[in-house]
């Protein structure tokens, strides 16, 4: 099953997350099919905090990809920001 989920990046105590499309059997930070955005929870500016390619999200959702709970909330939030 293909999932849209967060992959952690950044340094210790300074998280940075990539929004990736991956097979559900792969590890959290492992192999991915496509990187479709990022989320920086430390950033204060809303425009720099989250960036999502909504066209690619729609494409993957139409092909049956399942978003994680957190990614689902971020996608809804990004539609309101942009």
UniProtKB/Swiss-Prot annotation:
Domain of life: Bacteria
Cross-referenced InterPro entries: Ribosomal_bS16, Ribosomal_bS16_dom_sf
MF GO annotations: structural constituent of ribosome
Pfam families: Ribosomal_S16
Annotated protein name in UniProt: Small ribosomal subunit protein bS16
Keywords associated with the record: Ribonucleoprotein, Ribosomal protein
One GO term describing the cellular component: cytoplasm
Gene3D superfamilies: 3.30.1320.10
Keyword Hydrolase: no
Position of the signal peptide: none
GO biological process entries: translation
Entry similarity comment: Belongs to the bacterial ribosomal protein bS16 family.
């Amino acid at each position: 099953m293909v999932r849209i989920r967060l992959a952690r990046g950044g340094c210790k105590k300074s998280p940075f997350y990539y929004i990736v499309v991956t097979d559900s059997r792969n590890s959290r930070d492992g192999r991915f099919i496509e990187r479709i955005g990022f989320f920086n929870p430390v950033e204060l500016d809303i425009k720099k905090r989250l960036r999502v390619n909504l066209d690619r999200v729609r494409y993957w959702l139409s092909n049956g990809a399942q978003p994680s709970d957190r990614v689902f909330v971020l996608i809804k939030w990004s539609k309101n920001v942009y």
